[in-house]
Amino acid sequence: MGIQPSPVLLASLGVGLFTLFGLALGTYLVRRSRRPQVTLQDPDEKYLLRLLDKTTVSHNTRRFRFALPTAHHILGLPVGKHVYLSARIDGSQVIRPYTPVTSDEDQGYVDLVIKVYLKGVHPKFSEGGKMSQYLDSLKIGDVVEFRGPSGLLSYAGKGNFNIQPNKKSPPELRVAKKLGMIAGGTGITPMLQLIRAILKVPEDPTQCFLLFANQTEKDIILREDLEELQAQYPIRFKLWFTLDYPPEDWTYSKGFVTADMIQEHLPAPAEDVLLLLCGPPPMVQLACHPNLDKLGYSQKMRFTY
């Protein structure tokens, strides 16, 4: 006859197993509760976010901070994507795309840096920017409709870009060791989003090269952020500026983006090179693309936001 375990031993084992199960379940629930919740659950839904703060960045640029549903929420925006803001303005529905300057490491809020185009300032746009003026008029506590994630490009890390040729096409993988960027004005925000995402990962070998065009020195938004990143990562990130109307002591380039600027400050055409463009249409269409054609950059090597 074999040895039978005593009822006391069986009871002890049962209590021990139950305790272990309870500890495991408790640990799981705690970790789950600490995991941040995502705000942008559905790209077709609109999410009402409340204005928390509005600060002046420069003479015509503001930083708008919006509250997420709770202090433990993140926006949930993949790197490379943007959001749409929509509002009823003067009887019409106005929708504009924006790339936040915060990331999913920031919980409880999202920041947008936006240039405000006022009425009567630019002769070609006498009415100014409808959405930017609307946002500038908001009071703390007002709400705005957000929708996203949106966009044809997303960054998967270590030089891997998923790019859709159009909205209906599946994404195609593009691998780049060198990332060249040409930005104009507020077109810097998607570039900064990518640069930060790449540089914060020591194992990401992607090199970043940025050519940033503006009209005047005071128009350069997020300059301190960019120069701080350049100083911190001098090998991985190269930064260059050009101004239409530079001051006398300006040490960077002058004028529109040229072929010489591209040759000198961006990576040469190659299979492992990707160029990203974001800025005013005249700059992109009249200054950038013709010069990229001239220098031998294929369409596959470019992406325009």
From Swiss-Prot:
GO terms for molecular function: cytochrome-b5 reductase activity, acting on NAD(P)H; FAD binding. It is a single-pass membrane protein. GO terms for cellular component: endoplasmic reticulum membrane; mitochondrion. Keywords: FAD, Flavoprotein, Lipid biosynthesis, Lipid metabolism, Membrane, NAD, Oxidoreductase, Steroid biosynthesis, Steroid metabolism, Sterol biosynthesis, Sterol metabolism, Transmembrane, Transmembrane helix. Residues 44-156 form the FAD-binding FR-type domain. Belongs to the flavoprotein pyridine nucleotide cytochrome reductase family. This is NADH-cytochrome b5 reductase 1. It comes from Rattus norvegicus (Rat).
